[in-house]
Amino acid sequence: SHELKTPLTSISGYAELMQEGAVRPEDIRRFSGKIYDEAQRLIALVGDIIRLSQLDSRENLPPRVSTDLWELCETQLAHLEHAARKKAVSLHLVGDRVTVFGAEHILSEMVYNLCDNAIKYNKAGGSVTIELTALPDGAQLCVRDTGIGIPQEEFERIFERFYRVDKSHSREVGGTGLGLSIVKHAAAYHQATISVDSTLGEGTAITLHFPSPAADGFNTDLT
């Protein structure tokens, strides 16, 4: 509720001041900008909440088909190029040209959220690398960064809703706090496993292992 109340309180406060005429004409544009920014935060938050609800219920989700993961990653890195440039972070895609059995839109969200997070918690001059690996039993996607790192005792908690490792800079970093939770639920939808490896002050690697549709126990009819 805190994540919803904070932007709503800001919007209400700025709007009330403007309505009462307690704002100087030269401040109206600035206050309008604040209201717009908080509204955009709410739109993003509601969108992520809806996506999590869909993944939880497995309702209204796109079908899974054979998807070119390399091309998908290229597209998402292109979307993040501006954000990376602002942080002076370089983006890289290396490894094998692999395909996975998945829902393209949800896979795109997974890759975007992982890389967006890696950029936000990175250092100036750092890097974010997606490494794709073809395996006998499927494919592996690893997003590796040179950021602040995560304490080992918090590896599992980073996938909780609204959990942030660096709470003191949550407003500065931005985001909804739901990105990695969406990754976790989307991975489950694709029957993929997640592992985390991180060293404080050096960086983090989050790895997804996607099983082959030919693997034992793989459910191609999962909805």
Predicted segments with their positions:
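Conserved micro-motifs of the catalytic ATP-binding
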Residues: 57-63, 95, 99-105
